[in-house]
Amino acid sequence: MKLEQLLEGVSYTLVQGSLELDIEDIIYDSRKAAPGRLFVCIVGTQRDSHDYAAQCVADGVTALVVQHDIDLSTVPGAAVLKVESSRYALALMSGNLFGNPSRRMTMIGVTGTKGKTTTTHMIKSVLEAAGRKVGMIGTNGIYFLGHHQETANTTPESYELQKTFREFLDAGCDTALMEVSSQGLMMDRVAGIHYDIGVFTHLSPDHIGPGEHKTFEEYRSWKGQLFKRCTTGVVNIDDENTEALLEGHTCKLVTYGCSEKADYRAGTYQLLRTHDFLGVQFHVSGKDDMDVKVNMPGEFSVYNALAALTVGKVLGLPDEAIHEGLGRCVVKGRVELVPISRKFTILLDYAHNEVSTESLLTTLRAYDPHRLVVVFGCGGNRSKLRRYGMGEICAKMADFSILTEDNNRFEKVEDIIADIRMGMNKGNPDAKFVEIPDRLDALHYAVDHAQEGDLIAVIGKGHETYRDREGVKTPFLERELLEEYAQQIGLE
């Protein structure tokens, strides 16, 4: 592709060289420098890649995009283009390089502090029940037409994002569905993308601190940017931050919630539980009239399902597809049941801090189990406050806890458990718990000592497939390990 074509839509100044160059690829990692490539110099939080421009040119890079002045004598022969924001330019050029695939698919973006992952999976399930071919990007990875691959970020860098959209399109997808993080919006990873539907789930203080957002107001403002980049906004009208988040929105709004003012509203919900089902059932009224059954527990599942249902209605999908899609949706590592016994219920969840743990245990307690049992640990080389907090919450809310490892990294598991124990003692000096450092042994213990009617939550890892000890990651798939052990001991 000619450099001039690659720059379509980008505001730039040609500082040096020609626009008639042929560009084979775009890079923003100097280690990938090679002839025929364009290097985008980005100012990061840790380093400024403008410092690597000269070496990239020496390694054959044909053109440079810069955000501030560089010494032109160090980059002879290369085209140099100056832009106001390198990240923004990278996003637009990446779209051009891959033929702007997002313009040829239905685009759906989901944002919020909690609920993004589950809601995107629910939307995907509804769309597929209606016959749509869907590509999905989010916390759990990239999914399309039977393929799955991991991602480093909830919202990948713009180049990877556009490349993935191209893969979706080439594979025959007609819809791209993605989680849109505040970082993805702030860092221009989704610049140049217009969404047909933007979805807002929920907002609470998170991602506030160095390298993220300075204040909650800034965090909320960036979330709200999605609703200046979409045609229709599907929003949770019950959230206290909705009005402020939508300030300056340019899209049509369709609302969901439990309040009377919602376009699609849920009535009183009923909790449903068997050994292999933990969910809710509720009636939807307002602009529709239908019963919904969801294979996920708690009030938050009602809201997530309402969001998916509303997206389906905006797209004109039949009620049968919406009902079927919501009923069969399962999200890996999010209240994921492992049906290995009729005697008790065991599930996996990614809850890994005190807020998500308290939310999960509150939800599970509502199902009135014989005992609420929690298997958990905390990550090594991470905040000790999380250990105290999770210990305190579990001591207060669980009937029995099994303290174990969770990616120790370079810390001793005994030290981590000691910190958790301090939180347990603070939360409830009479809390019942046992310490089993090896997580596999802890899983076996939970199964061996399960009582009739117990609800066992194995939390912290969720969708993760590894165990990290001393920086070495080895396979650790909790669902498979539980199923293998149940078969080994002949569990019924």
What are the language-model segments listed below?
Residues 1-14, 35-38, 250, 287, ...:
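ATP-dependent carboxylate-amine ligase
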Residues 1-92, 228, 269, 293, ...:
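N-terminal leader/targeting and accessory segments in enzymes
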Residues 7-9, 70-77, 171, 196-346, ...:
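Acidic, Mg2+-coordinating active-site environments of NTP-dependent enzymes
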Residues 7-10, 89-233, 237, 241-249, ...:
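Phosphate-binding loop of NTP-binding sites
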Residues 44-46, 182-183, 204-207, 239-240, ...:
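Short glycine-rich anion-binding loops that position phosphate/pyrophosphate groups of nucleotides
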Residues 53-58, 169, 191, 365:
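Non-catalytic positions within long, well-ordered alpha-helices that form the structural scaffold/packing
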Residues 58, 62-68, 233-237, 375-376, ...:
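Short internal beta-strands
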Residues 136, 178, 198, 235, ...:
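Structural beta-sheet core signal
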